[in-house]
Amino acid sequence: MLKKIVTALGMSGMLLASSNAIAEDTTTKNDNLSPQSVDLSPLRNLNKLDSPMDKDYNYHQAFKKLDTEQLKKDMQDLLTQSQDWWPADFGNYGPFFIRLSWHDAGTYRIYDGRGGANRGQQRFSPLNSWPDNVNLDKARQLLWPIKQKYGDAVSWSDLIVLAGTVSLESMGMKPIGFAFGREDDWQGDDTNWGLSPEEIMSSNVRDGKLAPAYAATQMGLIYVNPEGPDGKPDIKGAASEIRQAFRAMGMTDKETVALIAGGHTFGKTHGAVPEDKVKQTIGPAPDKAPIEQQGLGWHNSYGTGNGDDTMGSGLEGSWTSTPTFWNHDFLHNLYNLDWKKTLSPAGAHQWTPTNAKPENMVPDAHKPGVKHKPIMFTTDLALKEDDGFNKYTQEFYNNPEEFKEEFAKAWFKLTHRDMGPKSRYIGPWIPEQNFIWQDPVPAADYKQVSTQDIAQLEQDIINSGLTNQQLIKTAWDSASTYRKTDYRGGSNGARIALAPEKDWQMNEPAKLEVVLTKLKEIQTNFNNSKTDGTKVSLADLIVLGGNVGVEQAAKQAGYNIQMPFVPGRTDATQAQTDIESFNYLKTKSDGFINYTDGSVSADKLPQTLVEKASMLDLNIPEMTVLVGGMRALDVNYDNSQEGVLTTTPGQLNNSFFVNLLDMSTQWKKSDKKDGEYIGIDRKTGKQKWTASPVDLIFGSNSELKAVAQVYAENGNEQKFVNDFAKAWHKVMMLGRFDVQQ
C-alpha cells in the first residue's frame, strides 16, 4: 500500500506544515528513565558547544554587511534557472520554495512555542527526513550557491523563509514585508514528536482526534492527511482535522482558508510513480540514504527520477491553469467545477472535475502542449463543504482583493510568528503595521527614571507596607511567563495586571490585586510629582519591587547586595493583549514556587520543573540556585510550607540545601497527601519538614545533588546569594529585546 511507503502524506500541498510540539510536562522522550529520574538535557545548550562559529560571532552584526537588494535579485534569478539534476516544474522554482518555507515555518506550536522557521531545524534529522518533507532536501540544495555566496551574513533560517517570500512576490503576490533575524541551530532538536505512524494510523489509538500537544495526526505528518483522515476521503472529517491543526498553531478559520487557498494557487503535487512500483523505486529519506548521495534522500529510479517522473506525496496534479501566477482560480475551480473522487497514478485519493472546460485545463509541468485536468485534495473540498470555512471561501471568491490582502497577512504571520516581538526584527523590509499576535507593547513616550529616581522608588516600595514575599512572588509571576521557544511572555508589558494573567490561579488573584493596587498608587504619585517628563511604568515597578524584596531578604540574612535594574519596560493595554493566545503561556506547574494545577502527576513534577527552567533559558546551576533561594524566601504558592527547609523563612540564605542534605533527617512518603514527603528527625522521630518531589530531586538526582552540595558547603554562603541574584536578574530581563544584553 502507498500509505505504508510514504505514510499517505500530501507533501507537495501548501496545506501541510509540520508539528514540532510537545506537552508542557516534557521536552524529550524519557522512556528509559525510572520514575525517580529526571532528564536534564533541556538545560544543556549544546548548540553553543556544537557551533562552528567564532565565539564572538554575532548574527545581527554580521547581517549589517549583507546587500539585501542583491540577495533578493539573486533569489529572483534562481527561480527560473532550472537545473538538470532537479528540473523546475513549469520552469519556475517559486512554488517549490513556497512549500519549503511553509513546511519550515509551519512546524510552529502555539501550545509550547516550539517549532517554526527560527533556528533552521528543517536542515536536521528528523525534520529533514519526515515523509511530509519529501524532496525539500533538493530545495535547500538549490539555495546552497546563494548561502555560499553570502556566507555568515545571512542565516539558513532567514534564507529558507526569504525564498518563499521572494517567490510569492515574483509570481504576483506582493507580501506585506519580511524580517530578518532568525539564527541557526547546529544540531537537531531532541523533541518528542508524538506517536509513530503505525500507532497513530490505528483508529483505536487516534480515534479521529488530534493530540493537542502535537496537532499533527502522526509523527512525520504535516498537520493533516490531504487524502482525508487515515487516508480516507472523508470531507467532513478532514474539515475537523484542519480546524484543530491550524488552531494549534494560532490560526483562525479566516487565516486557515487564506493560507490553504492561497498556497494551492501555485505549483503541483507529485505522484507519478505507479502504486505497484513505489516500493522498489523510491529510496530512503536523507537520514537513511547511502553515504554517496551526500545528504539527499528519496532517490527515485523510476524513469528519469525527476521532472514528470517525480514522486512526492503520491497525489498528482495542479489546482489551477496558471500554477506560477497569483489569482483566485483555486476558488473559482472549487465552486464552479463538479468534483469526482479518483486515484492518482500512485494510488492516492484525490478529486478531478467532471465538467472541466478547455480554460480550466492545467499545463504539464515539463511537456509543452500537454494538458491535464486540475485536481483538488479532500482537504481542499472541506473548505467548501464546512460551514465555517465556506463563509470565508465565498467571501474571498467574491472579493479577490480581500483574498490577496488576507493571504499576505496570514503568510507574514505564518513565517514570523515564532520570532517573538517586533523588537527582534532586523532588515529593511519590516512592515510598519503592528499585529496583536506580535504581543505589542507601546513605545515609551517619556523620560526614563534616573539613578536618583530609582532610589526614591525603592524607598517608596519599602515604605508601602508590602512584604518581601508579596513583592518577590509578584515579580516572579510576571517575568516567569517567558518562553524561549517563541520569545513570548516576560515582564515587559506588565500583562500580569491584565486579563487573562491577572486571573490565573497560580497568580493568586486576590493577593495579586493587593500588590498591584499599591504599586499603581506609587506609580501615580511618582509620575504626578515629576515635571520633567520622567515616568515609571508599572512593568518596571513590579520588577523593581522584586529586587527590593530580594535585597531586603538578603540584608536580613546578613548579606548586602545591590540588584541591577534596567528601566525601560512599558505597559501594554488590554486591547494589545490576545486573551486566548496568552492563555497558552499559563503553566500547569511551576516548581520554583511549588505550584501545580493538579493535572500533572506527582512523579512528573520534577520534569516539569526542568521544562519550566528550559523555557526560562536557565542552565542547571541557575535552576538549582533559584529553587533553593525561593524556598528560603518562603514564596511558595498559597503559602505552602513544602520545601521551606529553614528556621528563618523569608531570609535569603542557603538553608534549603544545608537542611536537604542533612543526614539527621529521614524522608518518607506522606500517607495523607499524594506527592508530599515528610522529613523526620532520625533520633526523635518527630516531623521537621515537608517537601515536594521537586524539592527532593535536588538530593536524589546525582547531577543536581552535586550542584546542591556546592551551595551547602561552608564558605559558599555568599556565593549562593550572589548566584541567586544573578539568576534572578536574568529572569527579570527575559524578553528585554529592546536593550543590548
From Swiss-Prot:
Keywords: Heme, Hydrogen peroxide, Iron, Metal-binding, Oxidoreductase, Peroxidase, Signal. It comes from the Bacteria. There is a cross-link at W102-Y223 (Tryptophyl-tyrosyl-methioninium (Trp-Tyr) (with M-249)). Transmembrane segments: none annotated. GO terms for molecular function: catalase activity; heme binding; metal ion binding. One of its GO terms (cellular component) is cytosol. The record marks R99 as: Transition state stabilizer. Its EC number is 1.11.1.21. Formation of the three residue Trp-Tyr-Met cross-link is important for the catalase, but not the peroxidase activity of the enzyme. Heme b binds at H264. The active site is at H103 (proton acceptor). PROSITE patterns: PEROXIDASE_1 (PS00435), PEROXIDASE_2 (PS00436), PEROXIDASE_4 (PS50873). It holds the Pfam family peroxidase. Binds 1 heme b (iron(II)-protoporphyrin IX) group per dimer. Residues 1-23 form the signal peptide. It catalyses: H2O2 + AH2 = A + 2 H2O; 2 H2O2 = O2 + 2 H2O. Bifunctional enzyme with both catalase and broad-spectrum peroxidase activity. Homodimer or homotetramer. NCBIfam families: cat_per_HPI, PRK15061.1. This is Catalase-peroxidase.
